[in-house]
Design a protein with these regions (language model features):
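Intrinsic disorder/low-complexity segments
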Residues: 1-31
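Non-catalytic alpha-helical scaffolds and adjoining flexible linkers that form interface surfaces
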Residues: 2-4, 31-213
Length: 213
């Protein structure tokens, strides 16, 4: 599924989407003439910008947490219809903003819809908690490749499995290990994570109460 919006591309047009490291432009993933950035990313939130446009929040492999504007996404017949939903993975291209962290989405190709993840409230709740945890420990627009991979694996699991307390503890433990804050295997990983966060996501309490062991 490919969506193109007001895309100018390089001199000969935008090439098929590739990761930053495989870009036909510069080595850092920019199209040489336009400054277009490219990355694999997971859609983690969308908010209303105007009557016709959305702000899309992403967790990307190469650029960390970023925000893009999807212009005209809410217009009738928009090419974005059905292609901007929570926890989709996509290859995207955007034009970086010069004076803010709100960039302009230029091209989008969905690579994984994760339709099974939307099949239950608990799966969505658990996925949302995982996202909140990562947002609490990662800097905006800072590469978080290991955290991206952790989230991707967790979402893939939730696509075909209901969450359990064991699964949540596994995610928290993996995150704490990745951050280098979980040295005591006998202690709950959430204890280590609390040291890095000002406050734990409120979603955890609701999630924990509804989960089985």
């Amino acid at each position: 599924v490919s969506v193109i919006l007001e895309s100018r591309g390089c001199k000969e047009g935008i090439q098929p989407l590739r990761s930053s490291r495989e870009s036909a432009g510069t080595a850092d993933g920019r199209c040489q003439d336009t400054g277009i950035e490219k990355s694999h990313a997971i859609l983690i939130r969308k908010t209303l910008l105007t009557e016709t446009s959305l702000i899309i929040h992403w967790c990307s492999r190469e650029h960390g947490f970023i925000r893009t504007v999807a212009k005209g996404a809410r217009r009738p017949g928009s090419p974005y219809a059905g292609k901007l939903d929570l926890f989709y993975t996509a290859e995207l291209a955007w034009l970086p903003a010069r004076k803010s962290d709100l960039h302009t989405l230029k091209e989008l190709e969905v690579t994984d819809f994760r339709l099974g993840l939307q099949s239950s409230y608990l799966r969505v709740l658990c996925a949302s908690y995982f996202v909140k945890l990562l947002e609490g420990v990662a800097e905006v627009e800072t590469p978080v490749e290991s955290l991206y991979d952790l989230l991707r694996r967790a979402l893939d699991y939730l696509t075909s499995h209901e969450p359990t307390r064991k699964a949540v503890l596994h995610f928290e433990r993996e995150l704490a290990h990745d951050l280098g804050v979980h040295g005591d295997e006998s202690a709950a990983p959430i204890t280590s994570l609390r040291q890095m966060l000002h406050r734990m996501p409120v979603l955890r309490e609701e999630l924990w109460e509804q989960l089985t062991s």
